Design a protein with these regions (language model features):
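Structured extracytoplasmic
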Residues: 109-282, 288-296, 359-461, 465-468, ...
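A short, solvent-exposed loop/turn motif at the edges and junctions
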Residues: 42-44, 69-80
Length: 878
């Protein structure tokens, strides 16, 4: 039965048809030369395309749409009758000199120029008039926004409906299928999410707030405890577009608006004709990117043919040649109008996107976003609307709205399939054996196993940490679990037990977290306000604290070199965390920690080393292996208090069952932390102060991609042994880990002052697109450089004669050789010579795989230096 159910799901996602396509070449009737960037569209349907550089085009046939329009400035517009039998349609366009209200339109074969271009002059007038339509010039405004996002399986063919065993055996699948009124294709809606927002604005003192008044979500995403991830990602990827802004973010990329100064440089504009949109006479302007490979839209602007130069309607299409993953076809249609009070604003915003990945296996999907703006008010607003913290405030009852609420605020009726979504999901869950399929899928997707359905109180996992190995444990088995809000929405428990068959020791961790705010499923849901107590005993690499994944992740446990210097760490931590809605986070903790070296790592003070050498010289000790010398320090203990502040305005993320994953990488991040330990308090062996800071920012270079910059620095202010010095963030696995060095070994450089710079440039295929094969593969080039400046002051340098017999400083890590000599594996950096490594990579292989070659440029004379390596990562990006 389980196999049969798996086949059902495989069959479900494999349903697909090859849509009827009309293709051909458009040429100049006189010269026979192909015409690039010619508009081809179904008039009034909002669906169209443009020819490529060779005049070629392809557009889907839609049942019932019989007229295909071909138009281009300087040519006669042609309307050609098409049918389901039309597959190849080559068109010859006749040149003309058009005149539009005394504006001369020159033939297309002339070189495009922005100077003295009537279309460009018209766009400049639109830009000049933008301020008059800006609602933020008002003292106050208030309006409501209704948004619906529907996600569906796309392109269900008639043959599939008729012959597929899935539809034959389970009729409710057939009942869920409906026809998309835009594409004319059969679709199978899988989820629908409705949200009602109230937006308020005050000019002086400036304040903007968005209140989430209602949320209604149904669909297959509800079958997963972290199903809100789909909604969060869709909302971030398909953000609202405001063409009156100079730049907007969409598909996680910045786009220049066609009505911006940058847009004039980025796009080519053509005046097409004059038409009536509703009752308003408009100029229709078409625009295309200068380079079809650049991230930009094609489309049309309908400009009022009067002195206001307002945008009446905007249609945006994403060219298929644009180097964006997964998007087969996209159309955005925005309509503007005049309010009863005279203001001009956006009223309707519709988006439809057809997407696919591994199309022959998974088929294609459709995302449709419907947005309506209504109930505008420009009267003074009460102060209470602006007193809440944060820019977006969610009503406590937002997810519990009744039918009366939705009858009032729902601006677009749900389709029959959308109305049946709840019963469709119920029918899915009633299939015999369905729970076993979901068990498998949840373990695969969420990396956790739920102990009950539908409301799991305890989740077992992470699955990928159950069986691993390392130098200390040998074979390591681990069992982990965590409670959910279904057990208690405020109190959460988490822990694991692990056993190493080599050292024959048990390791464990227990955590109790109390959330002051009620949670829906996980304690890390934003905004976080909690108190946590954690107790842990385990073996750790000093570099484990730098990786973002679990240290027992089976994929990162495979190291690029032999790593044999570990600690047994026993930690007890009390931590307080408070996040604010505007992106500010405060973290404070008190920690007791005991570090016992293991493997090839040992602690020995410089005074202890002098005693050891004296004992050897006097014949009191013999041998060549002194890792377990009687003059070693068995362990060290510290008790520290720390306060940290983090500011990340505009940051968005999704919650998995393990951690948060950032969604909006455009948000800057700034943090600062100070840690204090006082000798004698809670058994601490040392007094020290440590200060750290970091900053991150992404910079976009238009069509040249983006540059990510990480800047970090820190100071250890006091004299401390090497375990408490600053060590580089080293990545010892083959998996790419951001914010780490790829070729620095475990504790290779020890400093008490440091600064690091990590700059990476993802060129988004700008160079590869000039190579035909690579252009077709959509590979993307990537380069980066990582630099580390470090300094070890005299007070912490064990190699100086003045510290030869110091009771605090310890020998740097290393290994005894066969001759009894000591080979250091940790070194002091030259403060005038930064460590540098560079990266050159190919991203987006199969739209999934990232491979990078890393090269170390200096400090290669060190005996432990790794000069180069290969790293990889699985990640999907648009």
């Amino acid at each position: 039965m389980v196999k049969r159910l798996l086949l059902i799901f495989i069959g479900w996602f494999c349903m697909m048809e090859i849509a009827a396509q009309i293709h051909g070449v458009v040429v100049d009737a006189n010269t026979g030369e192909p015409i690039p960037y010619l508009n081809i569209y179904y008039d009034g349907k909002g669906v169209g395309t443009v020819t490529n550089n060779d005049g070629e085009y392809s557009i889907a046939y839609h049942a019932g749409w019989t007229k295909l329009t071909f138009s281009m400035v300087g040519y006669e517009t042609q309307e050609i009758i098409v049918s389901a039998k039309t597959s190849e349609l080559n068109v010859r366009m006749k040149e003309i000199d058009q005149m539009l209200d005394e504006i001369i339109i020159r033939p297309k074969k002339e070189k495009y120029s922005r100077k003295n271009n009537p279309a460009v002059e018209m766009i400049k007038k639109v830009i000049a008039s933008k301020r008059r339509t800006d609602l933020k010039q008002k003292d106050f405004y208030q309006y409501y926004k209704y948004q619906k996002i529907m996600f569906a399986k796309n392109n269900i063919t008639a043959d599939t409906l008729r012959e597929s065993w899935l539809f034959k055996q389970y009729p409710f699948f057939r009942d869920q299928v409906e026809v998309c009124d835009v594409t004319g294709k059969n679709i199978l809606p899988l989820s629908v999410d409705e949200t009602v927002y109230e937006n308020v604005y005050r000019k002086e003192p400036h304040s903007e707030k968005t209140y989430v008044r209602g949320i209604n979500s149904t669909g297959v995403n509800e079958l997963f405890s972290t199903g809100e991830m789909l909604t969060t990602v869709l909302k971030d990827v398909f953000q609202d577009i405001d063409i009156y802004q100079d730049r907007f973010r969409f598909l996680q990329y910045p786009f220049d608006s066609p009505i911006s100064e940058a847009g004039i440089r980025f796009y080519k504009f053509y005046i097409m004709d004059t038409i009536y949109v509703e009752r308003d006479k408009c100029f229709r302007l078409s625009f295309v990117p200068n380079n079809s490979q650049d991230f930009g839209f094609t489309g049309s602007l309908y400009i009022l043919a009067d002195s206001t130069y307002r945008v009446k309607q905007c249609q945006l299409n994403l060219p298929k040649k644009t180097d964006i993953n997964f998007v087969d076809h996209m159309v955005i249609d925005q309509k503007f109008g005049e309010l009863p009070t005279g203001e001009w604003t956006l009223l309707e915003d519709d988006m439809l996107c057809e997407m696919s990945y591994l199309k022959k296996v998974l088929g294609s999907f459709l995302v449709r976003r419907t947005t309506r703006y209504f109930d505008f008010n420009f009267d003074p607003l009460p102060n209470r609307l602006f007193k809440q913290k944060g820019k977006e405030i969610k009503d406590v009852n937002a997810m519990m709205r009744d039918n009366e609420f939705w009858s009032k605020y729902r601006q677009e009726d749900l389709t029959q399939s959308e109305q049946r979504m709840g019963s469709f999901v119920d029918d899915l869950t009633k299939i015999k054996g369905f729970k076993y399929v979901m068990f498998f899928l949840k373990a695969l997707i969420e990396n956790f196993v739920e102990t009950s359905t539908p409301d799991s109180k305890v989740d077992i996992g992470p699955i990928n940490t159950m069986i691993t190995s390392n130098y200390i444990d040998g074979l390591r088995l681990r069992a982990s679990a965590q409670t959910t809000a279904n057990l208690n929405p405020h109190l959460f428990l988490k822990g694991y037990y692990a056993y190493g068959f080599k050292d024959k020791r048990s390791k464990y961790m227990g955590e109790v977290e109390y959330s002051f705010d009620k949670k829906e499923y996980l304690p890390r849901e934003f905004p976080k306000h909690s108190m946590t107590f954690t107790y842990q005993y385990d073996n750790m690499l000093p570099s484990d604290k730098f990786i973002h994944t679990d240290k027992d992740n089976v994929f990162t446990s495979l190291k690029v070199c032999t790593v044999d210097q570990y600690n047994y760490e026993r930690k007890a931590t009390i931590k307080y965390e408070r996040e604010r809605e505007f992106g500010f986070k405060t973290t404070a903790f008190v920690r007791y920690a005991n570090y016992e070296p293991c493997g090839k790592l040992f602690y020995r003070t410089m005074a202890g080393e002098s005693q050891l050498q004296s004992a050897i010289a006097n014949g009191r000790l013999s041998g060549t292996e002194w890792v377990h010398s009687p003059f070693n320090t068995h362990d060290i203990t510290v008790a520290e208090a720390s306060i940290a502040f983090r500011y990340a305005p505009g940051e968005t993320f999704v919650n998995t069952k393990q951690r948060r994953l950032p969604v909006n990488l455009d948000a800057p991040v700034f943090s600062i932390q100070h840690t204090l330990s006082v000798k004698g308090i809670l058994g601490s062996d040392y007094t020290y102060n440590m200060t750290d800071f970091s900053a991150y920012k992404r910079f976009w270079l238009n069509s040249w991609g983006n540059i990510d910059v990480y800047l970090k620095g820190g100071i250890q202010w006091n004299k401390v042994p090497f375990p408490l010095l600053i060590m580089p963030a080293a990545n010892l696995s083959y998996i790419i880990q951001e914010e780490t060095f790829n070729l620095i070994n475990n504790m290779e450089f020890l400093n008490d002052r440091y600064a690091s710079l990590d700059v990476s440039w993802n060129m988004q295929g700008k160079l590869f697109n000039r190579i035909p094969l690579l252009k077709k593969l959509k590979w993307r080039e990537f380069i980066g450089v990582k630099c580390l400046w470090g300094k070890l002051t005299d007070k912490n340098n064990p190699f100086l004669e003045q510290n030869r017999n110091d009771n605090v400083l310890m020998m740097f890590p290393g290994h005894y050789n066969a001759a009894g000599g000591y080979d250091y594996s940790s070194y002091v950096m030259d403060p005038h010579k930064p460590y540098v490594e560079i990266t050159a990579g190919i991203h987006n292989i199969f739209k999934l795989l990232h491979i990078e070659y890393v090269r170390r440029l200096n400090y290669n004379n060190l005996p432990t230096a790794n000069k180069w390596g290969i790293r990889f990562m699985i990640r999907t990006v648009f």
